[in-house]
Amino acid sequence: MEENNIVLSRTQRMKDFVKSWALPVICFVVFWLIFKFVLMTSIIPTQSMYPTLSAPCFTVGVRTDVLNKPYERGDIVLFQRDDGNERFYAKRIVGMPGDVLEIKHGQTYINGVEYEESYLNETPEDLDFGPFQVPEDHYFMMGDNRNNSYDSRYWDEHFVPANKVMSKVYLHFHLGLSDKD
């Protein structure tokens, strides 16, 4: 009888061990799969999207291949450029495929109509650009901090191919660090 108790005791200990590790391991695998295939995170180190995203800012986006709807003008997205650099950029989609885009004295016009941008906190510098037509399967990107954003206005290739847009940003958190930290 004592032998059976020892065997049961070992069996019970093994079950308890498996139970105690199963939930954490399953949770880890599920979270890893979600962040590998569904969500995309990034830290935005610059003020190019200020005041919407204040650097340093942690962003969470849904990956393009999971997102089952097209991007819209005004969406903040994470993308890569065809510049040989592996880093991700966070900008706002301003120009959609087929749009004729022009900037006159800092004001953006899309298809000849003044584009209202309530998220800007200051008047953009007196810049003239275009008119250009956004090619099919491409986007024109600009940062919300127009006077401090390296974006489509300044790149040699002004337009971002749709296949380089990796995710749409849904959540963002200011990390609370200053430049002096």
Task: Describe the residue ranges of each PLM region.
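Active-site loop architecture of trypsin-fold serine endopeptidases
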Residues: 147-157
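Short strand-turn-strand beta-turns centered on an Asx-Gly dipeptide
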Residues: 110-112
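Short beta-strand-centered aromatic/proline hotspots
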Residues: 89-94
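Phosphate/adenylate-binding glycine loop and adjacent helical scaffold
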Residues: 143
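Acidic, glycine-rich loop-and-strand cores that form catalytic or ligand-binding grooves
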Residues: 99, 104-108
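Protein maturation boundaries and topogenic segments
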Residues: 1-88, 159-181
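Acidic loop->beta-strand submotif enriched in PP2C/PPM serine/threonine phosphatases
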Residues: 121-137
